[in-house]
């Protein structure tokens, strides 16, 4: 135990070189998604956010682009148009984000619409009602169906862990 405390103490006094800090920060930026999911989203807001994703720091060409922008399905084509040939992806929420409280058929239509609009990635929410009722098979089957609908598009599942209430629910 004493050895561990000494090692931790020595680590906390070490400084990280500026170059290493910048490298780490650039790596983090390159993995981030810029997201806007507000009722007041407009094409202008999407343009502003997308420009920031492409060039997070207009004064420094060494700062990489963000990984993606995430928008509602109805704004995917706008984001896609602005992205142009940059390497930034366009992600879209689907499955009636944020609640997910609709039949799977509606979720599939929502997902297909986002893909048809040009989404590179789909972000879904799980059926929390089914989860809280213990119907884990339904949750699983819906995720499988949505992944099949995505084809080769990347699928991410958003877990509202704050709503899962207990550590036992976070499995």
State the predicted function of each range.
Residues 1-30:
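Charged, compositionally biased N-terminal leader segments and the immediate start
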Residues 19-27, 40-64, 74-171:
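Alpha/beta enzyme core
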Residues 37:
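A short, histidine- and acid-enriched strand-loop-helix "catalytic/donor-clamping" loop
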């Amino acid at each position: 135990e004493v050895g561990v405390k000494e090692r931790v103490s020595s680590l906390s006094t070490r400084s990280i070189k500026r170059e290493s800090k910048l490298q780490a920060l650039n790596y983090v930026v390159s993995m981030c998604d810029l997201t806007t999911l507000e009722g007041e989203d407009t094409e202008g807001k999407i343009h502003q956010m997308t420009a920031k994703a492409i060039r997070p720091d207009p004064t420094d060409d060494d700062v990489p682009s963000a990984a993606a922008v995430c928008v509602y399905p109805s704004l995917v084509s706008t984001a896609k148009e602005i992205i142009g040939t940059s390497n930034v992806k366009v992600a879209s929420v689907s499955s009636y984000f944020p609640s997910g409280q609709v039949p799977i058929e509606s979720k599939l239509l929502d997902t297909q619409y986002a893909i048809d609009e040009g989404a590179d990635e789909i972000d879904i929410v799980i059926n929390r009602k089914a989860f809280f009722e213990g119907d884990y098979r339904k949750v699983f089957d819906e995720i499988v169906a949505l992944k099949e609908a995505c084809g080769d598009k990347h699928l991410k599942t958003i877990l509202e862990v704050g709503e899962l209430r207990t550590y036992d629910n976070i499995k």
